[in-house]
Amino acid sequence: MTSCVHLGIVASQSKKMSLAKRFAQLRKASPLFSLRGVYFSAASYDYREKLSRNVLLDLKLDDAVDLFGEMVQSRPLPSIVEFNKLLSAIAKMNKFDLVISLGERMQNLRISYDLYSYNILINCFCRRSQLPLALAVLGKMMKLGYEPDIVTLSSLLNGYCHGKRISEAVALVDQMFVMEYQPNTVTFNTLIHGLFLHNKASEAVALIDRMVARGCQPDLFTYGTVVNGLCKRGDIDLALSLLKKMEKGKIEADVVIYTTIIDALCNYKNVNDALNLFTEMDNKGIRPNVVTYNSLIRCLCNYGRWSDASRLLSDMIERKINPNVVTFSALIDAFVKEGKLVEAEKLYDEMIKRSIDPDIFTYSSLINGFCMHDRLDEAKHMFELMISKDCFPNVVTYNTLIKGFCKAKRVEEGMELFREMSQRGLVGNTVTYNTLIQGLFQAGDCDMAQKIFKKMVSDGVPPDIITYSILLDGLCKYGKLEKALVVFEYLQKSKMEPDIYTYNIMIEGMCKAGKVEDGWDLFCSLSLKGVKPNVIIYTTMISGFCRKGLKEEADALFREMKEDGTLPNSGTYNTLIRARLRDGDKAASAELIKEMRSCGFVGDASTISMVINMLHDGRLEKSYLEMLS
């Protein structure tokens, strides 16, 4: 055993003194020990009292170590049964390394193990994912004449299941039958859980019937494990059929099983089925809990059914099922997204009245709401409030507030938040950088936008196609086409595929810079790249031709567009109408206006402004203005 223990097993006692030091201090300072270490003082005979069931349930780790010290110093030594009680109690604290270390000390003191001791150690090694050492202990105990029992094999089974050796776990259960061990419900439950861990759902479900055939009745935990595993995989129909199977087998499903299926139905967007199952469980007298309600409220909120979600909140309060932070946060987020910030604020106030502390999700949702309604000072106040409550913002919270400031043209405050993120040890993500780059371009700070892009790359944050589109759009709009072309060429050579919007940015940039031929070449190359032009990119190219005075090319592309099945939009018609008006072609512009109106579009602000100016100059009749509106 000693050799097994020394194979890399050292008890982790970072906050505790080593056992050797503890024992040394006990000998030196405590009157519990005689000089010879043989006789206990009158106060220490009662270690047996400390090993009573009630005391062990409340035993603290420090006290357990002290108690072990008392026991090994006691004469005569306590029986192995007494030591087993203590080791078992420590194992239940999940302090497996300590159990192994104490077991090693017992061996050094020549305290012989019994089967129960070996089972404790095997379980600890398995729980530490050290199956080879568990098997070594098994080998040693069998050499000493101890036959493994169902507890031994169940521990090993758990070790196999969690050690990515599921086939050996299945083989072990088969071997148990051969060896005439009778696997119990716990054994099967362990294997079922292991099968789900290794994505063997069908085998796990089949094991239920195999259990029954072997005379072992599945219990609530068995079904709960299978239902949970199936729901995580999205096999909800099978989970529902198991629910019916439970009813036939006179096993009453509990709130946990119903909630698991309801949550899965919600996750897979079957909200009405989830509500029906909720009603079914209620009719059967199974009282829903806060988790059940939270699943449904969250799902209803995601569907924009915030009024139904609010009714569920009222229902749970009436039934004295206390909503928690998850409940309120889901509703607050839904109200914010629906633009109902006043209702969201009322819910927040209700949370505070109920002494429910908001979490980062609550604060982030409200901050987003304030930003959406241009209430940036209140958003900043909420941000500062959450920090004062020791609820520290994450990258998403910062991104929300930075976006709000950038949208309001308060980019410097957004930059200040960006710097604050770094000071807090948070690294901005792609969204952070995209927001700042776009905000800086919109604020006219082209140079700083480029610097932030360079910082993004140097910080190892990967730009995405949105980043490149923002960068290219900004460069083109500020007349830096040459730089944009360099970036675009790099993008084309990279593994990242430009999308239709990226191509549109470049074509528009080329056309506005007077390089219509280059824009046309890029447009023509789209089909070779497998990109189908949409109405936006057609309109951009038509606008480029019109700007250059290439009326025939614009008309030809307009016809091609319709033949291609791409319907013109308001922008397409207005672009062509303005071009015809500039050329003085009243008849052609009138025809286009009629066609546009028949498609349900009207003149945009630019077209109407042009017509009004031409009316004042006497170049157009009033009928044109009436036609447009």
Swiss-Prot record:
PROSITE patterns named in the record: PPR
Record-stated family: Belongs to the PPR family. P subfamily.
Family matches, as Pfam families: PPR_1, PPR_2
Start-end of each PPR repeat: 79-113, 114-148, 149-183, 184-218, 219-253, 254-288, 289-323, 324-358, 359-393, 394-428, 429-463, 464-498, 499-533, 534-568, 569-603
Keyword terms of this UniProt record: Chloroplast, Plastid, Repeat, Transit peptide
Listed InterPro entries: Pentatricopeptide_rpt (IPR002885), PPR-containing_protein (IPR050667), TPR-like_helical_dom_sf (IPR011990)
Intracellular or extracellular location(s): Plastid, Chloroplast
Transit peptide: 1-41
GO cellular component, one term: chloroplast
Domain of life: Eukaryota
First-listed, main subcellular location of the protein, grouped into a coarse class: plastid
Protein name (record): Pentatricopeptide repeat-containing protein At1g62930, chloroplastic
GO biological process: mRNA processing
Transit peptide listed as a keyword: yes
